[in-house]
From Swiss-Prot:
Subcellular location, record wording: Nucleus; Cytoplasm
Listed GO biological process terms: DNA recombination; DNA repair; DNA replication
Post-translational modification, as annotated: Phosphorylated by ATR (MEC1) and ATM (TEL1) upon DNA damage. This appears to be required for the function with the RAD1-RAD10 endonuclease.
Name by which UniProt lists this protein: Structure-specific endonuclease subunit SLX4
Primary residence: nucleus
HAMAP family: Endonuc_su_Slx4 (MF_03110)
Phosphoserine PTM sites in chain numbering: S289, S329, S355
Length: 748
């Protein structure tokens, strides 16, 4: 350390001598004081530098050699270092050292370590810049030399990817042969003389619009001709027509060209086609000929001669395989199975029911009064119009006289009418149908009817036969029913009705749902009296004479005439003597009033208790509501079909108003329901039905299945009853579905 100090002091001394020699006049007292201060405050160097380890090692080696070498060598080294410092100070690039006038003095000033580190960083940065500038200036100089040397030479610009300049070899143009077929369609048309329309019709088979357009263009003109220019004025084309005289001339020419025939020739042709009987009248009467042709087309085929009948009968009897069949009309007319249980009710004679023939086997009846005469014929031809296509004997009007039946009743072993010839030469025997239908009944010989306590009545009792529930088209017109009963197992009539009912399945036959509410919109078709007296009366079929004898208070005077439901039913003179009357039943309330008059004390007690219960019912209802929890009240709202409410008070008010409205609308159902709400959803449905019945225009739309907007239906119901606003929308939809009302969601 001391050695280094000594070396540095020696360096300063040498520098001072040099400065004094060069510029002695510039020194003053202040510079000397600063120099003295620098000497006094000089700190020994701690060898902190930013240079590499090699530099530090070299400095140490130099210091060691300096100790061994003489002083002269140290002086020379100091001189070289001084020259280097002078060059650095004179270099304009170095900006890290401040210019205080003397560069050597600045190095001797004591500086803080932090400032010194920053200065070292700046010095290192300048050194690096100098090293980099060496390359910078050399690169610029080389570029400058190149530009100067190559200034007169212009570089060629070439694309990165060169395109191939290979030219495609073009084929030499050759003339086309005119014999080559360009279009096969034109070739076929020209060679085979087919029209353009026919060829296109073949190609465009099935495309009617294109075909019609093609035909239209063909009809308008030849396609070979150039199309005519359209008339700018839009005038329609005019055509020449024949006048009346020209038409007459054309008719004469046509008549002269074609041969004429006389009326006798036409009559011969008609005789050959239709026979001699049909051509007896002349053809001048056009109406008679048309009527004759119409009647001839409607008449059944003629019967064969009487000589052929025995041969036909023998052939029928000799046939071994007889096919038993019935036509559809015969099946519909057959009441032998359905009416088996009602034969005892139908009025008929015992000897008439024993006959097995359809028309010939009927035994003669005794004429009584003006009811049945000897010359009265029983026309049953209308009953067997359905047999005319199969039975060759059904074509003749089957008029059976009562007097002739006695004469022809000797041979009743075989019936010719029941034989039907099949197209395959097979025959069969028809089943007997309804023997009692064409039998006239006399008033004197009428057997007693099944009577009731009221008098001589005939009730429409439900049928208990296995075919019950099947629609009978001969007895009533076709109409949709609510359900069809299909028996799974046919049992005998001797067994009980309960066993048969257990084996029946209900199949819905219409769009009405299987769950039918208590009320339906069909009740609106009834009168008010019928609505009020639905359960208090019974409708029966009675003789008008017996109805007059009954009490007029019990029987209504609006009688209904008995009409045949089927158009093919035969009307008899006894139909006017029967009528259908509504007889009022005994009211149970009147009986209870009579009993109450007998026991006045008990009746008074009952009245008092009922009045007390009716008075206390709203309070009890409110107490029951308040005692229930919110969960139970909300559940009751959901089951009944009302809108959900938030608070308990609103729920109770909604249930109270609903119970009051429904109790006034249906007073008979009061107190039937238990639990929180004393009404059900079905009662709400009934109330909505009553509200909608007040609008006939709305009912007409419902009956015609017109889609009705839901909001319009709700507004209609709300106008009649504001309580509808508290009913849930899903409840209204369910009610509409049950009643068959078509709804839609749009608000149009």
């Amino acid at each position: 350390m001391e050695l280094q100090r000594a070396q540095r002091n020696l360096k300063f001394l040498q520098n001072e001598d040099y400065v004094n020699v060069t510029d002695q006049t510039n020194l003053n007292g202040e510079s000397q004081n600063a120099y003295s201060l620098g000497m006094e405050t000089q700190v020994p160097e701690m060898q902190f530098s930013l240079s590499s380890d090699d530099d530090s090692i070299s400095t140490q080696v130099k210091s060691v050699t300096a100790q061994k070498s003489p002083i002269t060598q140290e002086t020379t080294k100091n001189d070289t270092e001084r020259n280097k410092d002078v060059d650095k100070s004179c270099n304009p690039v170095s900006t890290s050292q401040p210019d205080l006038g003397e560069s050597n003095i600045e190095e001797n000033i004591f500086i803080n370590t932090q400032i010194q580190s920053r200065l070292d960083d700046a010095e290192e940065e300048t050194n690096l810049k100098l090293k980099l500038e060496k390359f910078k200036y050399s690169f610029k100089s080389s570029n400058a030399d190149d530009t100067h040397s190559n200034a007169n030479v212009t570089a060629k610009r070439r694309p990165a990817i060169r395109k191939a300049n290979s030219k495609l070899k073009t084929k030499p143009k050759t003339k086309r042969d005119p014999k080559i077929i360009k279009n096969i369609t034109d070739f076929n048309i020209n060679n085979y003389e087919r029209s353009r329309t026919a060829s296109l019709l073949k190609q465009l088979s099935g495309k009617h619009k294109k075909v019609l357009d093609i035909i239209k263009t063909q009809n308008e003109g030849n396609s070979d001709k150039p199309p005519r220019a359209r008339n700018n004025k839009g005038e329609k084309a005019t055509f020449d027509t024949y006048s009346e005289q020209e038409w007459k001339d054309i008719m004469k020419l046509l008549l002269q060209k074609f041969p004429q025939s006389e009326e006798t020739d036409l009559n011969e042709v008609q005789k050959f086609l239709y026979g001699s009987e049909k051509s007896s009248s002349s053809l001048d009467n056009q109406e008679s000929s048309q009527q004759r042709l119409w009647t001839a087309s409607q008449l059944p085929p003629e019967l064969p001669d009487e000589a052929i009948q025995p041969e036909q009968e023998e052939r029928i009897r000799d046939t071994q395989s007889a096919v038993n069949f019935l036509s559809l009309s015969q099946v519909m007319d057959d009441k032998s199975e359905i009416m088996k249980d009602e034969e005892s009710i139908i009025i008929s004679r015992g000897d008439s029911t024993s006959s097995q023939e359809y028309g010939n086997g009927l035994e003669p009846q005794q004429p009584v009064g003006n009811v049945v005469g000897e010359d009265i014929e029983l026309a049953v031809g209308t009953r067997i119009n359905a047999f005319s296509l199969t039975d060759y004997k059904a074509c003749k009007p089957m008029s059976v006289e009562v007097s002739r039946r006695c004469e022809n009743s000797t041979d009743n072993d075989y019936d010719n009418i029941s034989i039907v010839s099949d197209t395959t030469d097979e025959t069969s025997t028809l089943f007997p149908l309804d023997q009692y239908r064409y039998v006239f009944i006399e008033n004197d010989e009428r057997p007693p009817l099944a009577t009731d306590t009221i008098g001589s009545t005939q009730f429409f009792t439900p049928n208990t036969s296995p075919l019950d529930g099947i629609i009978d088209l001969t007895q009533e017109s076709f109409k949709a029913v609510r359900s069809l009963i299909s028996p799974l197992k046919v049992e005998n009539n001797k067994t009980g009705v309960t066993s048969q009912a257990s084996n029946q399945v209900q199949v819905p036959a219409t769009r009405t749902p299987t769950i039918i509410p208590q009320k339906n919109l069909t009740t609106t078709l009834k009168t008010e009296e019928e609505k009020n007296n639905i359960g208090s009366s019974i409708r029966v079929k009675l003789l008008q004479e017996s109805v007059v004898k009954l009490n007029p208070k019990l029987v209504k005077h609006n009688f209904y005439r008995v009409e045949a439901n089927d158009s093919e039913e035969e009307d008899t003179e006894f139909d006017d003597q029967f009528c259908i009357a509504d007889i009022q039943l005994v009211d149970s309330s009147k009986i209870s009033t009579k009993d109450s008059t007998q026991n006045p004390t008990t009746s008074n007690d009952i009245i008092d208790t009922s009045a007390a219960s009716s008075i206390a019912s709203p309070e009890k209802f409110c107490e029951i509501m308040m005692s229930q929890s919110m969960k139970e009240l909300r559940q009751s709202l959901k089951t009944v079909g009302l809108k959900p409410m938030r608070t308990k008070v609103e729920i109770i008010q909604s249930l109270q108003t609903a119970s009051q409205i429904l109790s006034t609308a249906n007073p008979d159902n009061k107190g039937e329901h238990g639990g929180v709400a004393n009404f059900s959803k079905i009662e709400i449905f009934d109330h909505l039905t009553e509200l909608i019945e007040a609008f006939p225009d709305f009912l007409e739309r419902i009956y015609t299945f017109e889609p009705i907007p839901l909001n319009e239906l709700i507004e209609k119901l709300f106008s009649a009853e504001p309580f509808v606003s508290q009913i849930d929308e899903m409840t209204i939809r369910e009610w509409a579905d049950v009643q068959g009302i078509c709804l839609r969601n749009d608000k149009k």
